[in-house]
């Protein structure tokens, strides 16, 4: 497993943020196993869009940690 990567979406419009998340996940997937923390801040709308438009169509595991509701942790283990 690679070290945890971080993607901070502060300052991005939703469309740009979604494209950046998609591109980052594709890049990390090509490398194999990964862990990615996506920082969304207080935007529950953006979080929901990331869940519905990107993550639900992937085999990745993801969750919003209880200690920081402004982020999404995504992980993938390739055997």
Q: Which residues fall in each region the model found?
A:
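Long, charged, low-complexity intrinsically disordered regions
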Residues: 1-79
């Amino acid at each position: 497993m690679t070290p945890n990567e971080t993607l901070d979406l502060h300052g991005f419009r939703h469309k740009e943020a979604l494209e950046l998340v998609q591109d980052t996940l594709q890049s990390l997937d090509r490398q194999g196993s990964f862990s990615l923390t996506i920082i969304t801040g207080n935007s529950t709308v953006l979080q929901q869009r990331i869940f519905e438009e990107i993550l639900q169509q992937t085999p990745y595991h993801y969750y919003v940690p209880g200690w920081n509701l402004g982020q999404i942790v995504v992980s993938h283990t390739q055997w």
